[in-house]
C-alpha cells in the first residue's frame, strides 16, 4: 500500500465510503484502481460500493445536454397535459424498453421521495421492473410500500426483490373476484379496507398503462384476469387502455357496464386523485392512445415513456 492511503477500510462507515469514492471517481477523475489504493480497499469493493451508491440514491448522475431526456418532447407534453413531472428516454436501438422504463421511473422516484414516505404500487411489468431498480433506495430511505389492488402473484416479481425488513402492505384479496357479490364482500373486510385507505394516503403512486391494441401482449390478459373474448368485447365498447384493470375510452372516460369493473378489488381510478403524485410508466408506440387517454382522464400527473412513444403522442394530439 502506498503513502496515498488516507484511511483504512475500518475507519469509515459504509455511507462515508460511498461518498468519498463517488467524489474521487466523478469529481477528481480517479480510476477505481487509484481509489482502491488511496482508501485501502480492494478494487472489487470500490466497484461494488459505486453500484450500491447508485441503487441507494446517494449517487445521482446528471447529464447536461440538449439531447438528455428529449427535452423538446418533455416540454411539449408537460405543457399540453399540465404534468407535474415527465421523463422521455432517448431512443436506443435494440435496448430492452421495459428495463429502460423501469430505470427511468426509479430515478424519478429517487428524486421525489423522502425518507419514510409511502409509495403505492400498481401491478404490471413496468412497475415491477421499477421496484427491482429501487430495492436499494427503498431499504436505505426506509420507504414504505402499499399495493393498489388485490392479487399477490402480480406483485411478487418486484416485492420479492426487496429486503425482508421493508414495510409492505399487501391487499389480502385477489385482484378479481369470481362475482360482483364476492368482490363486494371482500372489499368490506376490515383487512382489505385498511389497505385501501392506506393506499389512498400514499405520498406517491406508480402505475402501468395497458393498451387494448396490445392484444395477447397485454399484461392483464397474460396474467389471466381477462379472457380474449372479454378483451374483444371491451375494445368494441370503445376502450383504448386500462389502469389497475379499469378500462377507459380515448377521452379518459371509464367504459360503463363492463363485468370486470364490478369484480375488481382495489382502488378505483377516481380514488387516485387523493395521491399527490401518480406516475404512469408505459412505452411502445402502440400505447400512445392509451397514455393520452390516461392523461386526459387525469388518472396520472407524471409520466415516464420513451422517445418514439412521445413522438407518436405529439403526432396524435397535433392532428
From Swiss-Prot:
Inactivated by phosphorylated autoinducer-2 (phospho-AI-2). Phospho-AI-2 acts by binding to LsrR, which is then unable to bind to the promoter regions, allowing the transcription of the target genes. The keyword DNA repair does not apply. Residues 32-55 bind DNA. It comes from the Bacteria. One of its GO terms (biological process) is regulation of DNA-templated transcription initiation. InterPro entries: NagB/RpiA_transferase-like, SorC_transcr_regulators, Sugar-bd_dom_put, WH-like_DNA-bd_sf. It is found in: Cytoplasm. Induction: Autorepressed. Belongs to the SorC transcriptional regulatory family. This is Transcriptional regulator LsrR.
Amino acid at each position: 500500500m502506498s503513502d496515498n492511503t488516507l484511511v483504512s477500510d475500518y475507519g469509515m462507515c459504509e455511507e462515508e465510503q460511498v461518498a468519498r469514492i463517488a467524489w474521487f471517481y466523478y469529481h477528481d477523475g480517479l480510476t477505481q484502481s487509484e481509489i482502491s489504493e488511496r482508501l485501502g480497499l480492494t478494487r472489487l469493493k470500490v466497484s461494488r460500493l459505486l453500484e450500491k451508491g447508485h441503487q441507494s440514491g446517494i449517487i445521482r448522475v446528471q447529464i447536461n445536454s440538449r439531447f438528455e431526456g428529449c427535452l423538446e418532447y418533455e416540454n411539449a407534453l408537460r405543457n399540453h397535459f399540465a404534468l407535474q413531472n415527465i421523463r422521455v428516454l432517448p431512443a436506443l436501438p435494440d435496448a430492452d424498453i421495459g428495463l429502460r422504463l423501469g430505470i427511468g421511473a426509479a430515478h424519478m422516484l429517487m428524486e421525489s421521495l423522502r425518507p419514510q414516505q409511502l409509495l403505492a404500487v400498481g401491478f404490471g411489468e413496468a412497475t415491477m421492473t421499477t421496484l427491482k431498480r429501487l430495492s436499494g433506495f427503498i431499504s436505505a430511505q426506509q420507504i414504505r410500500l402499499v399495493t393498489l389492488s388485490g392479487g399477490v402473484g402480480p406483485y411478487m416479481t418486484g416485492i420479492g426483490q426487496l429486503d425482508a425488513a421493508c414495510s409492505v402492505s399487501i391487499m389480502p384479496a385477489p385482484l378479481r373476484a369470481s362475482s360482483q357479490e364476492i368482490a363486494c364482500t371482500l372489499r368490506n373486510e376490515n383487512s382489505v379496507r385498511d389497505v385501501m385507505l392506506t393506499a389512498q394516503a400514499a405520498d406517491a403512486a406508480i402505475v402501468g398503462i395497458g393498451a387494448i391494441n396490445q392484444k395477447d401482449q397485454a399484461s392483464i390478459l397474460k396474467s389471466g384476469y381477462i379472457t380474449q373474448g372479454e378483451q374483444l368485447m371491451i375494445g368494441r365498447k370503445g376502450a383504448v387502455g386500462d389502469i389497475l384493470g379499469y378500462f377507459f375510452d380515448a377521452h379518459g372516460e371509464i367504459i360503463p357496464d363492463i363485468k370486470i369493473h364490478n369484480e375488481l378489488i382495489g382502488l378505483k381510478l377516481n380514488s387516485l386523485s387523493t395521491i399527490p403524485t401518480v406516475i404512469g410508466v408505459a412505452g411502445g408506440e402502440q400505447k400512445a392512445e392509451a397514455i393520452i387517454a390516461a392523461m386526459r382522464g387525469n388518472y396520472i400527473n407524471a409520466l415516464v415513456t420513451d422517445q418514439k412513444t412521445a413522438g407518436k403522442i405529439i403526432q396524435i394530439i397535433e392532428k
